[in-house]
């Protein structure tokens, strides 16, 4: 059993995509009994209860006293102490930038192998000269740098330098949790007073890049073609009031439901209530604000729902165009409206896409399959290359 230390700013109970990614992988690595895991992560509300549950599951979480960890002396000392105390063989930096700058220090403390994972924000880093030099140092100091999509790799590979060993490790989907669920669908449709109305769902943090504003603006056009069409926007974020005002200004406030943030255990049901899942994401900030992958599309597919994705970054990699869903220009209200209306009208095609999506995700995107690949990277098995 190899001994692994995960050093990360992003870990449950804090919510977010990276947090979920790391939490899912840690749970499966521990469950496989191939790795003894220790996690070093920041303090967060609810951490005590989470850490008790982690201990019961078979791994230890050590909390940094503040909510942010930087690659300075304080984190360095604590990390090296943990490496010594637990006789750590492999250090895994959950987000390469910036904490993986400590890779050489981890080796000095006794770690024989260092892995760093990327997610999407490194694309922005690669566009800034000083930040780009940080990525080069990380590439030089680690054994493996993982990436979540071919798109992100294409954008930042040169920044990590020729010495970096870049390996594909996307997020997975729990296909036992995310599945077609008629009972949950009926319950939530009753809660939100949707009845049998044709419904498009967008589940994501409410920020401009995700394209909820495009869906709201497209809804009048969709409703002219699809009687009773409704939009359910799931999630919280700084864009909420802007979206509420936009719905009012577009005359569709009565047909848009804002659920706010929902409990993690209710996320599968919110996918299941949809007839179509759409997130017309778009790239912003001259390419610095981009969708790294888009796990929500895969979760919707696992629930048997056809998906519509914007063509930002790695999002198209989560859709088999014209088979599991559609990829559209997320900047175009007309194209988004056409795609949504098309699938709401042609129910046979939509159902077939949903079934194909479920089959694809089950075959290619399960967490257990990807965790086995990560386990090889952590051990340094040549077969993983």
From Swiss-Prot:
**Sorted alphabetically, which Gene3D superfamilies does this protein's record hold?**
Glycogen Phosphorylase B
Which residues are involved in binding GDP-alpha-D-mannose? 205, 210, 262, 299
InterPro entries assigned to the protein according to its UniProt record, in alphabetical order: Glyco_trans_1, Glyco_trans_4-like_N, Glycosyltransferase_grp1
| Top enzyme category | transferase
Q: What is its EC number?
A: 2.4.1.346
* Catalytic activity entry: a 1,2-diacyl-sn-glycero-3-phospho-[alpha-D-mannopyranosyl-(1<->6)-D-myo-inositol] + GDP-alpha-D-mannose = a 2,6-O-bis(alpha-D-mannopyranosyl)-1-phosphatidyl-1D-myo-inositol + GDP + H(+); a 1,2-diacyl-sn-glycero-3-phospho-[alpha-D-6-acyl-mannopyranosyl-(1<->6)-D-myo-inositol] + GDP-alpha-D-mannose = a 2-O-(alpha-D-mannosyl)-6-O-(6-O-acyl-alpha-D-mannosyl)-1-phosphatidyl-1D-myo-inositol + GDP + H(+)
The record's comment on protein family reads: Belongs to the glycosyltransferase group 1 family. Glycosyltransferase 4 subfamily.
What is the name of this protein?
GDP-mannose-dependent alpha-(1-6)-phosphatidylinositol monomannoside mannosyltransferase
Encoding gene, per UniProt annotation = pimB
